[in-house]
Amino acid sequence: MGDQRGTRVYVGNLTDKVKKDDLEGEFTKYGKLNSVWIAFNPPGFAFVEFEHRDDAEKACDILNGSELLGSQLRVEISKGRPRQGRRGGPMDRGGRRGDFGRHSITSGGSGGGGFRQRGSSGSSSRHTERGYSSGRSGASSYNGREGGGSGFNRREVYGGGRDSSRYSSGSSASYGRTGGQSAGRFRSRSPVGNHRF
């Protein structure tokens, strides 16, 4: 009994001189054939289907590399749609590289820009916040470090404008009053202390 579908054999490296009858006459020596098909567009290969797989394998072993009408034959068992497998691999690998690149560009563009923006004002703004809370820096020192339009934007973000001017005037006034009162009390007490001794 033959195989249910037969076994197809690929025959390559054919010249224009090789015809269907030539292949059929050569391959039928090794077993019963179901069909012989020669490609014309593009030319150069053919398929020969054997009824029995054992006969097909024997023909491949003997005829592969042999010469027929000036053609050095390439004869092997047909593997079935090998082109799709080769085409699928590179497409998958190429698709994965395009997504990481786009992802890298997108994330790098937005993330890097945000990082540079934070980095340009992050250290000075953090020092400025500590300066406001401790009452040692004031608005004048903040403006001196930053200066220009960038200082104006950051004063709005970190409580500048009226708040900074009110704080600077209030802190200087309170500091002056405190310093004056403490100095006055110290001077007023020192003569009394000396008089007692």
UniProtKB/Swiss-Prot annotation:
The keyword Secreted does not apply. The modification Phosphothreonine is found at residue 106. It comes from the Eukaryota. GO terms for molecular function: mRNA binding. Pfam families: RRM_1. Residues 89-102 have a biased composition (Basic and acidic residues). Residues 117-144, 166-176 have a biased composition (Low complexity). GO terms for cellular component: nuclear speck; nucleus. InterPro entries: Nucleotide-bd_a/b_plait_sf, RBD_domain_sf, RRM_dom. Residues 7-80 form the RRM domain. The modification Phosphoserine is found at residues 168, 171, 174, 188, 190. CDD domains: RRM_SRSF3_like. It is found in: Nucleus. The keyword Lipid metabolism does not apply. Extensively phosphorylated on serine residues in the RS domain. Residues 74-197 are annotated as: Disordered. Keywords: Nucleus, Phosphoprotein, RNA-binding. GO terms for biological process: mRNA cis splicing, via spliceosome; regulation of alternative mRNA splicing, via spliceosome; regulation of gene expression; regulation of mRNA 3'-end processing; regulation of transcriptional start site selection at RNA polymerase II promoter. May control important aspects of development. PANTHER family: RIBONUCLEOPROTEIN RB97D (PTHR48038), SPLICING FACTOR, ARGININE_SERINE-RICH 1-RELATED (PTHR48038:SF3). Belongs to the splicing factor SR family. This is RNA-binding protein Rsf1. It comes from Drosophila melanogaster (Fruit fly).
